[in-house]
Amino acid sequence: MSWQTYVDDHLCCEIDGQHLTSAAILGHDGRVWVQSPNFPQFKPEEIAGIIKDFDEPGHLAPTGLFLGGTKYMVIQGEPGVVIRGKKGTGGITIKKTGMPLILGIYDEPMTPGQCNLVVERLGDYLVEQGF
């Protein structure tokens, strides 16, 4: 299965009639493995900040999580494994696996719980597959 299939069929799939606005799979080095067409252009330092928060949970809490110039307020996740952010009616979920980061961005009417489910389910599957 190609990485594009994971984004198209597993991240951008429909859940209760809703779907993510954009999604991507990145290496821990910030390189894009695959992304949806509308995934925001991000800066290397934004990914570096995300990786640092996985290594040092709470690092992003004072400043917020930035991706593509958009600032998300960091909300409770799973230290070292999942980072969740909120901005207005939308947000972001990032799951760290052994090799890639799985990122999902949503907006209403999708809920944070639906985004978490989609992103974390794929991340758990990839961990089981050795990624």
From Swiss-Prot:
InterPro entries: PFN, PFN_euk, PFN_sf, Profilin_CS. It comes from the Eukaryota. It comes from Hordeum vulgare (Barley). Binds to actin and affects the structure of the cytoskeleton. At high concentrations, profilin prevents the polymerization of actin, whereas it enhances it at low concentrations. By binding to PIP2, it inhibits the formation of IP3 and DG. This is Profilin-1. Disulfide bonds: none annotated. Pfam families: Profilin. Transmembrane segments: none annotated. Keywords: Actin-binding, Cytoplasm, Cytoskeleton. GO terms for molecular function: actin monomer binding. The keyword Cytoplasm applies. It is found in: Cytoplasm, Cytoskeleton. Belongs to the profilin family. Occurs in many kinds of cells as a complex with monomeric actin in a 1:1 ratio. GO terms for cellular component: cell cortex; cytoskeleton. The lineage of its organism: Eukaryota, Viridiplantae, Streptophyta, Embryophyta, Tracheophyta.
